[in-house]
């Protein structure tokens, strides 16, 4: 797809904005990757809930990537059992995703293993309902907030990672 100047946040944002505009309502997942050299790639497996990276020849270590979550598949956050573990495995520096309602970002996960993530996630699961109650969220909104809070709380337990979510 091209190459960008890694020191130009404006250039990266222009690619990202075009990507969001083009794939915001797609029925399949698509991912835009900017590797550590600035090479830009577009990936899809034509699947609604994942991108198969098996035969992909891109160095993800140190990369920035963003992918869409089709409306029928969104959890209003990253999937804690696929997106985050893949990030930990491949060394992605910054991972973003978006759905029809939110955009989310996870970074600074260097040094966290999948085993540590699974343990923190397990502990965090026990806290989701009480955190929702503490924040005054209605349990009828569980689907919209559960994964968001789970990832946020897992990062807090690990003392690693910066996770944010904002409305589009």
Regions found by a protein language model. Give the residues of each.
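Short beta-strand scaffold segments in enzyme catalytic cores
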Residues: 28-36, 95-98
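Active-site-proximal loop/helix of nucleotide/amide-processing enzymes and allied scaffolds
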Residues: 1-2, 50-168
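A short catalytic or substrate-binding loop motif that flags glycine-/basic-rich loops and adjacent residues
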Residues: 23-27
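Structured interaction and signal-relay segments at domain junctions
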Residues: 41-51
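Short secondary-structure junctions
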Residues: 40-41, 164
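Short Pro/Gly-enriched beta-strand edge/turn motifs at strand-loop
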Residues: 11-18
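Short glycine-rich, polar/acidic loop-and-turn segments at beta strand-coil junctions
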Residues: 35-37, 46-47, 69
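Low-complexity, glycine/serine/proline-rich disordered segments
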Residues: 1-10
